[in-house]
Design a protein with these regions (language model features):
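Structural loop-to-beta junction motif characteristic of Rossmann-like glycosyltransferase folds
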Residues: 52, 120-121, 269-270, 287-295, ...
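C-terminal alpha-helical cap of glycosyltransferases
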Residues: 355-376
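Conserved nucleotide-sugar phosphate-binding/catalytic loop shared by glycosyltransferases and other
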Residues: 2-10, 30-83, 231-233, 322
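Glycosyltransferases and closely related glycan-assembly transferases
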Residues: 87-100, 108-123, 136-140
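Active-site-proximal region of nucleotide-activated glycan assembly enzymes
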Residues: 42, 53, 116-178
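A short, well-ordered alpha-helix in the C-terminal region of glycosyltransferases
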Residues: 342-356
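Donor-nucleotide binding loops and adjacent catalytic segments primarily
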Residues: 46, 178-271, 304-307, 312, ...
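Acidic donor-binding loop of glycosyltransferase active sites
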Residues: 97-99, 262, 266-280, 288-289
Length: 376
Protein backbone atom coordinates (compact mmCIF):
# COMPACT_ATOMS: atom_id res chain seq x y z
CA UNK A 1 0.00 0.00 0.00
CA UNK A 2 1.25 3.45 -0.96
CA UNK A 3 -0.33 6.33 0.96
CA UNK A 4 0.08 10.06 0.35
CA UNK A 5 -0.75 12.63 3.03
CA UNK A 6 -0.99 16.25 1.93
CA UNK A 7 -0.93 19.12 4.40
CA UNK A 8 1.08 22.13 5.40
CA UNK A 9 1.65 25.67 6.48
CA UNK A 10 1.20 25.29 10.23
CA UNK A 11 1.37 22.57 12.85
CA UNK A 12 -2.42 22.54 13.03
CA UNK A 13 -2.59 21.00 9.56
CA UNK A 14 0.54 18.87 9.81
CA UNK A 15 0.30 17.18 13.22
CA UNK A 16 -3.09 15.49 12.58
CA UNK A 17 -1.69 13.99 9.37
CA UNK A 18 1.36 12.70 11.23
CA UNK A 19 -0.92 11.20 13.90
CA UNK A 20 -2.90 9.26 11.29
CA UNK A 21 0.25 8.25 9.41
CA UNK A 22 1.70 6.76 12.59
CA UNK A 23 -1.43 4.68 13.24
CA UNK A 24 -1.54 3.56 9.61
CA UNK A 25 2.10 2.47 9.81
CA UNK A 26 1.32 0.46 12.94
CA UNK A 27 -1.53 -1.31 11.15
CA UNK A 28 0.28 -1.71 7.85
CA UNK A 29 4.04 -1.78 8.53
CA UNK A 30 4.84 -2.66 4.92
CA UNK A 31 3.10 0.46 3.60
CA UNK A 32 5.01 3.28 1.94
CA UNK A 33 4.05 6.77 3.12
CA UNK A 34 4.79 10.08 1.38
CA UNK A 35 3.86 13.62 2.41
CA UNK A 36 3.23 16.48 -0.03
CA UNK A 37 3.61 19.98 1.42
CA UNK A 38 4.58 23.51 0.46
CA UNK A 39 8.00 25.12 0.14
CA UNK A 40 8.98 27.00 3.27
CA UNK A 41 6.25 25.56 5.50
CA UNK A 42 6.62 23.97 8.94
CA UNK A 43 6.23 20.60 7.23
CA UNK A 44 9.85 20.86 6.09
CA UNK A 45 10.83 20.45 9.74
CA UNK A 46 8.02 18.38 11.23
CA UNK A 47 7.54 15.68 8.60
CA UNK A 48 11.18 14.51 8.32
CA UNK A 49 11.47 14.68 12.11
CA UNK A 50 8.51 12.28 12.32
CA UNK A 51 10.35 9.89 10.01
CA UNK A 52 8.40 10.41 6.79
CA UNK A 53 9.44 11.39 3.28
CA UNK A 54 8.33 14.82 2.02
CA UNK A 55 7.99 16.42 -1.41
CA UNK A 56 7.17 20.13 -1.63
CA UNK A 57 5.34 22.43 -4.04
CA UNK A 58 5.74 26.18 -4.65
CA UNK A 59 3.82 27.80 -1.76
CA UNK A 60 1.52 30.78 -1.40
CA UNK A 61 -2.18 31.23 -0.74
CA UNK A 62 -4.53 33.60 -2.52
CA UNK A 63 -4.60 37.27 -1.48
CA UNK A 64 -7.97 38.78 -0.58
CA UNK A 65 -6.72 42.27 -1.51
CA UNK A 66 -7.81 43.93 -4.77
CA UNK A 67 -4.66 46.08 -4.85
CA UNK A 68 -2.18 45.76 -7.71
CA UNK A 69 0.16 43.80 -5.43
CA UNK A 70 -2.69 41.48 -4.41
CA UNK A 71 -3.77 40.85 -8.00
CA UNK A 72 -0.15 40.29 -9.05
CA UNK A 73 0.28 37.76 -6.25
CA UNK A 74 -2.89 35.91 -7.24
CA UNK A 75 -1.77 35.63 -10.87
CA UNK A 76 1.46 34.04 -9.65
CA UNK A 77 -0.42 31.74 -7.26
CA UNK A 78 -2.76 30.57 -10.03
CA UNK A 79 0.20 29.86 -12.31
CA UNK A 80 1.88 27.89 -9.53
CA UNK A 81 -1.40 26.08 -8.85
CA UNK A 82 -1.72 24.76 -12.40
CA UNK A 83 1.94 23.75 -12.31
CA UNK A 84 1.45 22.11 -8.89
CA UNK A 85 -1.53 20.03 -10.05
CA UNK A 86 0.57 18.66 -12.90
CA UNK A 87 3.49 18.02 -10.55
CA UNK A 88 1.17 16.23 -8.11
CA UNK A 89 -0.18 14.02 -10.89
CA UNK A 90 3.39 12.96 -11.65
CA UNK A 91 4.20 12.39 -7.96
CA UNK A 92 1.05 10.29 -7.48
CA UNK A 93 1.77 8.20 -10.59
CA UNK A 94 5.47 7.71 -9.78
CA UNK A 95 4.69 6.79 -6.17
CA UNK A 96 1.87 4.48 -7.21
CA UNK A 97 -0.47 6.01 -4.62
CA UNK A 98 -3.46 3.93 -3.55
CA UNK A 99 -5.04 6.81 -1.60
CA UNK A 100 -4.46 10.53 -0.95
CA UNK A 101 -5.41 12.05 2.42
CA UNK A 102 -5.61 15.82 2.94
CA UNK A 103 -5.66 17.65 6.28
CA UNK A 104 -5.55 21.26 5.10
CA UNK A 105 -3.07 23.85 3.95
CA UNK A 106 -2.11 25.21 0.54
CA UNK A 107 -0.59 21.99 -0.83
CA UNK A 108 -3.75 19.98 -0.17
CA UNK A 109 -5.71 21.49 -3.04
CA UNK A 110 -3.44 20.55 -5.98
CA UNK A 111 -2.71 17.12 -4.52
CA UNK A 112 -6.39 16.28 -3.96
CA UNK A 113 -7.42 17.70 -7.32
CA UNK A 114 -4.72 15.60 -8.98
CA UNK A 115 -6.00 12.51 -7.14
CA UNK A 116 -9.52 13.24 -8.37
CA UNK A 117 -8.37 13.64 -11.96
CA UNK A 118 -6.48 10.35 -11.72
CA UNK A 119 -9.45 8.57 -10.07
CA UNK A 120 -7.37 7.78 -6.97
CA UNK A 121 -9.42 7.41 -3.74
CA UNK A 122 -9.09 10.41 -1.44
CA UNK A 123 -10.45 11.87 1.78
CA UNK A 124 -10.25 15.27 3.42
CA UNK A 125 -10.19 16.07 7.12
CA UNK A 126 -11.55 19.49 8.16
CA UNK A 127 -10.56 20.50 11.67
CA UNK A 128 -12.72 23.60 12.10
CA UNK A 129 -16.45 23.84 12.66
CA UNK A 130 -16.83 25.87 9.45
CA UNK A 131 -14.94 24.47 6.43
CA UNK A 132 -12.11 26.55 5.03
CA UNK A 133 -11.59 27.59 1.42
CA UNK A 134 -9.41 24.60 0.48
CA UNK A 135 -11.96 22.14 1.87
CA UNK A 136 -14.83 23.76 -0.01
CA UNK A 137 -12.82 23.73 -3.23
CA UNK A 138 -11.84 20.05 -3.04
CA UNK A 139 -15.19 18.62 -1.92
CA UNK A 140 -16.13 17.67 -5.48
CA UNK A 141 -12.92 15.64 -5.90
CA UNK A 142 -12.87 13.81 -2.56
CA UNK A 143 -14.58 10.52 -1.72
CA UNK A 144 -15.03 11.34 1.98
CA UNK A 145 -15.25 14.58 3.97
CA UNK A 146 -14.19 13.91 7.56
CA UNK A 147 -15.26 16.40 10.21
CA UNK A 148 -14.79 17.04 13.92
CA UNK A 149 -18.23 18.28 14.89
CA UNK A 150 -21.65 16.79 13.96
CA UNK A 151 -23.12 20.29 13.53
CA UNK A 152 -20.59 20.99 10.75
CA UNK A 153 -22.25 18.54 8.35
CA UNK A 154 -24.71 21.17 7.09
CA UNK A 155 -21.91 23.07 5.34
CA UNK A 156 -21.28 20.23 2.86
CA UNK A 157 -23.16 19.71 -0.40
CA UNK A 158 -23.04 15.90 -0.52
CA UNK A 159 -24.10 14.53 2.86
CA UNK A 160 -23.28 10.97 1.79
CA UNK A 161 -19.58 11.88 1.85
CA UNK A 162 -19.60 13.30 5.39
CA UNK A 163 -18.44 11.33 8.44
CA UNK A 164 -17.69 12.56 11.95
CA UNK A 165 -14.30 11.37 13.22
CA UNK A 166 -13.11 14.04 15.67
CA UNK A 167 -9.58 15.44 15.53
CA UNK A 168 -6.62 13.06 15.21
CA UNK A 169 -3.92 13.67 17.79
CA UNK A 170 -0.72 11.79 18.42
CA UNK A 171 -1.19 8.93 20.86
CA UNK A 172 1.39 10.46 23.20
CA UNK A 173 -1.09 13.22 24.06
CA UNK A 174 -3.40 10.55 25.43
CA UNK A 175 -1.02 8.12 27.10
CA UNK A 176 1.83 10.24 28.56
CA UNK A 177 2.10 10.33 32.36
CA UNK A 178 2.59 13.70 34.10
CA UNK A 179 5.26 12.74 36.63
CA UNK A 180 7.36 10.77 34.14
CA UNK A 181 7.27 13.70 31.70
CA UNK A 182 8.23 16.21 34.41
CA UNK A 183 11.20 14.06 35.34
CA UNK A 184 12.20 13.70 31.69
CA UNK A 185 12.19 17.50 31.31
CA UNK A 186 14.09 18.08 34.56
CA UNK A 187 11.28 20.07 36.17
CA UNK A 188 10.83 20.53 39.91
CA UNK A 189 7.68 20.38 42.03
CA UNK A 190 6.39 23.89 41.21
CA UNK A 191 3.37 24.13 38.88
CA UNK A 192 4.22 24.19 35.18
CA UNK A 193 2.76 26.72 32.75
CA UNK A 194 2.98 26.01 29.02
CA UNK A 195 2.29 28.86 26.60
CA UNK A 196 2.29 28.57 22.84
CA UNK A 197 0.59 30.63 20.17
CA UNK A 198 1.18 28.59 17.04
CA UNK A 199 4.19 27.31 15.15
CA UNK A 200 4.76 30.74 13.59
CA UNK A 201 4.14 32.77 16.73
CA UNK A 202 2.03 35.87 17.40
CA UNK A 203 3.63 39.27 18.07
CA UNK A 204 1.03 40.61 20.51
CA UNK A 205 0.96 37.36 22.45
CA UNK A 206 4.74 37.10 22.63
CA UNK A 207 4.86 40.67 23.96
CA UNK A 208 2.20 39.79 26.54
CA UNK A 209 4.12 36.66 27.54
CA UNK A 210 7.34 38.63 28.04
CA UNK A 211 5.48 40.92 30.45
CA UNK A 212 3.90 37.88 32.14
CA UNK A 213 7.38 36.50 32.75
CA UNK A 214 8.35 39.82 34.36
CA UNK A 215 5.36 39.47 36.70
CA UNK A 216 6.43 35.92 37.49
CA UNK A 217 9.91 37.16 38.41
CA UNK A 218 8.35 39.86 40.61
CA UNK A 219 6.34 37.18 42.39
CA UNK A 220 9.45 35.07 43.01
CA UNK A 221 8.89 32.58 40.20
CA UNK A 222 5.96 30.68 41.80
CA UNK A 223 5.78 28.36 38.80
CA UNK A 224 7.88 27.14 35.91
CA UNK A 225 7.02 28.57 32.50
CA UNK A 226 7.81 26.92 29.16
CA UNK A 227 7.06 29.15 26.17
CA UNK A 228 7.08 28.23 22.48
CA UNK A 229 8.03 31.50 20.79
CA UNK A 230 7.44 30.55 17.15
CA UNK A 231 9.67 31.19 14.17
CA UNK A 232 8.61 34.81 13.57
CA UNK A 233 9.30 35.93 17.13
CA UNK A 234 12.50 34.03 17.77
CA UNK A 235 14.76 36.84 16.53
CA UNK A 236 13.42 39.46 18.94
CA UNK A 237 11.46 37.96 21.84
CA UNK A 238 14.39 36.52 23.86
CA UNK A 239 15.96 39.99 23.78
CA UNK A 240 12.70 41.59 24.94
CA UNK A 241 12.50 39.14 27.84
CA UNK A 242 16.07 40.00 28.84
CA UNK A 243 15.26 43.72 28.69
CA UNK A 244 12.55 43.03 31.28
CA UNK A 245 15.19 41.53 33.56
CA UNK A 246 14.28 37.91 32.90
CA UNK A 247 16.59 35.23 31.55
CA UNK A 248 16.32 31.51 30.87
CA UNK A 249 16.73 29.90 34.28
CA UNK A 250 15.22 27.06 36.29
CA UNK A 251 11.78 28.69 35.97
CA UNK A 252 11.79 30.26 32.50
CA UNK A 253 12.32 28.23 29.32
CA UNK A 254 12.09 29.86 25.89
CA UNK A 255 11.95 27.55 22.85
CA UNK A 256 11.70 28.53 19.18
CA UNK A 257 9.47 25.51 18.59
CA UNK A 258 8.40 22.77 20.99
CA UNK A 259 9.05 19.56 19.10
CA UNK A 260 8.18 17.31 22.06
CA UNK A 261 4.77 18.91 22.64
CA UNK A 262 3.05 15.74 23.97
CA UNK A 263 5.72 15.45 26.67
CA UNK A 264 5.64 19.14 27.58
CA UNK A 265 1.84 19.30 27.60
CA UNK A 266 1.59 16.22 29.82
CA UNK A 267 4.00 17.86 32.25
CA UNK A 268 2.00 21.10 32.34
CA UNK A 269 -0.59 22.13 34.89
CA UNK A 270 -2.02 24.89 32.69
CA UNK A 271 -1.81 25.57 28.95
CA UNK A 272 -2.13 29.10 27.55
CA UNK A 273 -2.70 29.10 23.80
CA UNK A 274 -4.61 30.14 20.73
CA UNK A 275 -7.77 28.19 19.91
CA UNK A 276 -7.04 26.46 16.64
CA UNK A 277 -8.94 23.21 16.30
CA UNK A 278 -5.83 21.04 16.44
CA UNK A 279 -4.53 22.73 19.58
CA UNK A 280 -7.92 22.55 21.31
CA UNK A 281 -8.17 18.83 20.62
CA UNK A 282 -4.61 18.14 21.78
CA UNK A 283 -5.38 19.96 25.02
CA UNK A 284 -8.61 17.97 25.40
CA UNK A 285 -6.82 14.67 24.79
CA UNK A 286 -4.22 15.55 27.42
CA UNK A 287 -6.87 16.85 29.83
CA UNK A 288 -4.83 19.92 30.81
CA UNK A 289 -6.87 22.94 32.03
CA UNK A 290 -6.36 25.86 29.69
CA UNK A 291 -6.61 29.58 29.09
CA UNK A 292 -7.52 30.16 25.45
CA UNK A 293 -6.79 33.46 23.70
CA UNK A 294 -8.35 33.08 20.23
CA UNK A 295 -6.65 34.81 17.33
CA UNK A 296 -8.77 37.64 15.89
CA UNK A 297 -6.90 37.34 12.58
CA UNK A 298 -8.55 34.20 11.19
CA UNK A 299 -11.27 33.52 8.65
CA UNK A 300 -14.84 33.71 10.00
CA UNK A 301 -13.51 34.20 13.53
CA UNK A 302 -13.36 30.40 13.81
CA UNK A 303 -10.96 30.37 16.77
CA UNK A 304 -13.34 32.23 19.05
CA UNK A 305 -16.06 29.77 18.02
CA UNK A 306 -13.77 26.88 18.96
CA UNK A 307 -12.88 28.51 22.28
CA UNK A 308 -16.48 29.34 23.20
CA UNK A 309 -17.53 25.76 22.45
CA UNK A 310 -15.04 24.53 25.07
CA UNK A 311 -15.92 27.32 27.50
CA UNK A 312 -19.64 26.44 27.32
CA UNK A 313 -18.79 22.90 28.43
CA UNK A 314 -16.60 24.10 31.29
CA UNK A 315 -13.46 22.94 29.50
CA UNK A 316 -11.63 26.27 29.08
CA UNK A 317 -11.22 29.81 30.33
CA UNK A 318 -11.34 32.34 27.48
CA UNK A 319 -9.73 35.78 27.26
CA UNK A 320 -10.18 37.77 24.05
CA UNK A 321 -6.98 39.31 22.71
CA UNK A 322 -8.41 42.83 23.04
CA UNK A 323 -8.76 42.23 26.80
CA UNK A 324 -5.61 40.17 27.21
CA UNK A 325 -3.06 41.76 29.53
CA UNK A 326 -0.28 39.97 31.35
CA UNK A 327 -1.97 40.79 34.65
CA UNK A 328 -5.28 39.31 33.48
CA UNK A 329 -3.51 36.08 32.51
CA UNK A 330 -1.55 36.01 35.78
CA UNK A 331 -4.79 36.42 37.74
CA UNK A 332 -6.46 33.60 35.80
CA UNK A 333 -3.47 31.28 36.35
CA UNK A 334 -3.61 31.89 40.10
CA UNK A 335 -7.38 31.42 40.15
CA UNK A 336 -7.15 28.04 38.42
CA UNK A 337 -4.27 26.79 40.56
CA UNK A 338 -5.85 27.91 43.83
CA UNK A 339 -9.37 26.54 43.18
CA UNK A 340 -8.70 22.82 42.91
CA UNK A 341 -12.39 21.99 42.58
CA UNK A 342 -12.76 24.22 39.49
CA UNK A 343 -9.43 22.94 38.17
CA UNK A 344 -10.50 19.30 38.44
CA UNK A 345 -13.89 20.02 36.84
CA UNK A 346 -12.15 21.59 33.84
CA UNK A 347 -9.81 18.59 33.59
CA UNK A 348 -12.78 16.19 33.58
CA UNK A 349 -14.71 18.29 31.03
CA UNK A 350 -11.77 18.23 28.64
CA UNK A 351 -11.49 14.45 28.78
CA UNK A 352 -15.21 14.13 28.01
CA UNK A 353 -14.77 16.21 24.84
CA UNK A 354 -11.76 14.30 23.53
CA UNK A 355 -12.10 11.69 20.78
CA UNK A 356 -9.08 9.51 21.60
CA UNK A 357 -9.65 7.08 18.72
CA UNK A 358 -10.01 9.74 16.00
CA UNK A 359 -6.88 8.65 14.13
CA UNK A 360 -8.09 5.05 14.30
CA UNK A 361 -11.44 6.09 12.82
CA UNK A 362 -9.67 7.81 9.93
CA UNK A 363 -7.60 4.71 9.27
CA UNK A 364 -10.80 2.63 9.23
CA UNK A 365 -12.21 4.90 6.51
CA UNK A 366 -8.95 4.79 4.55
CA UNK A 367 -9.15 0.99 4.65
CA UNK A 368 -12.73 1.10 3.36
CA UNK A 369 -11.68 3.35 0.48
CA UNK A 370 -8.84 1.00 -0.44
CA UNK A 371 -10.79 -2.20 0.20
CA UNK A 372 -9.09 -5.14 -1.46
CA UNK A 373 -5.65 -3.55 -1.24
CA UNK A 374 -5.19 -3.51 2.55
CA UNK A 375 -4.41 -6.42 4.79
CA UNK A 376 -5.01 -6.20 8.53
Amino acid sequence: MNVIFTCGGTGGHINPAIAVANIWKERHPDSNILFIGADGGMEEQLVPKAGFQLKTLPGGGLSRSLSFAGIKKNVKVMYNLVSSVNRCKKIIKDFGADIVVGTGGYASFPALMAAGLLKIPSCVHESNAVPGLTTRMVERWADKMLICFPQSARYYKDQSKVQVVGMPVRSEFIHNKKQACREELGLDSRPVILSTFGSLGAKAMNEMTAELMRLEKEAGYPFQHIHGVGSYGWEWMPKLVEEKGVRNNDAIFLKEYIYNMPTVMAAADIVISRAGASTCNEIAAAGVPCILIPSPNVTANHQEKNARALEEQGAAAVILEENCTAQAVMDKIRQLLEDRNAYNKMHDALLEIAVPDSAQRMCDIMEELTSGKTKK
